Amino acid sequence: MSFLNRLFGKSDASQHNQGGTTMLNIGIVLGSTREGRVSPQVGEWVKELADKRGDANYEVIDIADYNLPLLGEAGQDASGAATWSEKIAQMDGFIFIVQEYNHSISASLKNALDYLRVEWNDKAAGIVSYGSVGGARATEHLRGVLSELSIAHVRVHPALSLFTDFENGTHFAPKDVQAQSVNDMIDQLLPWTEAMRSVRTKAGEVANN
């Protein structure tokens, strides 16, 4: 068992179904909508690794599938907002697939985050990033945004390099070590997600009293 597993506790299907509790729903959010993006390749790879664990329900959520114009811009069709709200509300936690744009996250991801508030609150998230320096600077920016939205973000952070984990910058071919990094991140994410679900449940009980 790795140091991280000893420290945070390795999550498995039996641990997350004790007492008949419902399995956690984890949304893998693709953070880019641009033409020619590689985030779908990264997202499907993360989902494939996660599904092998059998410890939660994992679903890829593509921002591009929702009609989300710039928030507050007059005369725009924001018909996708209600569907976006419903989908995010269904999730217990998230894995954000993040690419770096000028030291930050994409405008589409920031916009999608800004559309909602309570749907994000008291949930947990992990981050998988990529870029010339592994998307590290975008990740640090995203952490500040997630904190403001009351999303607890785990420390372990798989960082993919455009130089070593991609071929010609377009074909995703991760090094073997990256799979372990993703699993270590999920090992942290699931206990945090379970804990935050308890927070939401307790808050609901208080509100109903």
Region locations from a protein language model:
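N-terminal beta1-alpha1-beta2 submodule of the flavodoxin-like/Rossmannoid cofactor-binding fold
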Residues: 2-115, 172-209
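Mobile beta-alpha loop/short-helix "lid" or hinge segments that flank ligand
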Residues: 59-69, 149-169
